[in-house]
């Protein structure tokens, strides 16, 4: 058997426990995020106090926002995630790979041995450069492909560019999304509604269609859904619709592509501390108390979802398809 497919009983049990219980091998102390210093702990930690809790300072950025300007800065696994070679030699394309869950997945994939191409909105270049440097620091190939996912021609070009630069594709993560809070449906213009739909629904449709020409048995497609698909809030009318649609395209496409040996799964985050929230995704009042409604009483950090994206792409998850994996601090479904 190939090395990447071989796993001992002990390492399998240990690995599964680690994947399901935590987002990284070495956790981060909560106060580290406020000081931008990272302290590693090898012991157990209370998940309720592991990361910053509300109230948060008032802050606002133009859409789509930058990780580097958030306070506290999110943990995307820059210093907390340690890989074990689970994705050695794999080739991944991640949309929205500059920040949030996409950034966490990109860092984790590189540290698990994968080459990674990331897409991002052109104004996010500052964050994207950091991710590219982190990928290269692991000795992996890093490809930056900025562009607007509302453009069908660009989405096809994105896939072609990534496949050419990486010499193939094994993992496709449709993660990029637009989220803007509106008190009423009357406040949403047709242009804004179209922007959300094009980014969150059309783009994955175009990207997956283009990617199928490169995908072989054993590859993985992963979509980022949301707790909003199951428990939508009144102020995210358009965004919540797209996440319900994401959940259903994952389940439908998984059945369609299973005979081809292609797995399709999703991740459904709850309230996660990302640039999406500070750039119009939440009202200032909700932002100050962000995550307080969860049983854990705090928002999640992108790094806490990184291992889920790794697990769904790994060979030892070969029987998992059409599944939605939640990470929401105890609220919502699944």
Feature-to-residue mapping (PLM):
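N-terminal secretory signal peptides and thylakoid transit peptides that target proteins
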Residues: 2-20
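Short C-terminal tail/terminal secondary-structure segment
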Residues: 70, 78-79, 182, 309-310, ...
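Short, small/polar-rich loop/turn modules that mediate ligand/substrate recognition or access, typified
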Residues: 258, 263, 320-322
């Amino acid at each position: 058997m190939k090395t990447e497919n071989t796993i001992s009983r002990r390492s399998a049990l240990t690995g599964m426990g680690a994947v399901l219980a935590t987002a990284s091998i070495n956790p981060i102390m909560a106060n580290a995020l406020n000081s931008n210093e990272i302290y590693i702990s090898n012991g157990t930690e209370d998940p309720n106090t592991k990361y910053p809790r509300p109230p948060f300072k008032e802050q606002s950025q133009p859409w789509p926002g930058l990780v580097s300007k958030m306070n506290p800065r999110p943990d995307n696994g820059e210093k907390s995630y340690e890989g074990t070679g689970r994705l050695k030699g794999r080739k991944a394309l991640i949309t929205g790979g500059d920040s949030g869950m996409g950034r966490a997945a990109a860092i984790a994939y590189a540290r698990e041995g994968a080459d990674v191409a990331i897409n991002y909105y052109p104004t996010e270049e500052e964050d994207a450069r950091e991710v590219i440097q982190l990928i290269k620091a692991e000795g992996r190939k890093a490809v930056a492909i900025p562009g607007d996912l509302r453009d069908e021609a660009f989405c096809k070009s994105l896939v072609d560019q990534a496949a050419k630069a990486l010499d193939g594709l094994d993992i496709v993560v449709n993660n990029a999304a637009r989220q803007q809070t509106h008190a009423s449906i009357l406040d949403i213009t047709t242009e804004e509604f179209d922007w959300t739909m094009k980014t969150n629904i059309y783009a994955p449709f175009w990207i997956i269609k283009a990617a199928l020409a490169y995908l072989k048995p054993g590859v993985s497609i992963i979509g980022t859904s949301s707790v909003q698909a199951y428990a939508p809030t009144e102020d995210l009318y358009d965004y919540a619709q797209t996440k319900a649609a994401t959940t259903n395209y994952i389940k439908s496409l998984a059945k369609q592509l299973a005979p081809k040996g292609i797995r399709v799964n999703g991740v459904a985050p709850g309230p996660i501390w990302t640039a999406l929230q500070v750039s119009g995704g939440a009202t200032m009042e909700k932002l100050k108390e962000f995550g307080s409604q969860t049983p854990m009483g705090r928002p999640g950090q992108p790094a806490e979802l990184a291992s889920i994206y790794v697990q769904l792409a790994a060979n030892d998850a070969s029987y998992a398809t059409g599944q939605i994996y939640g990470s929401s601090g105890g609220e919502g479904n699944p």
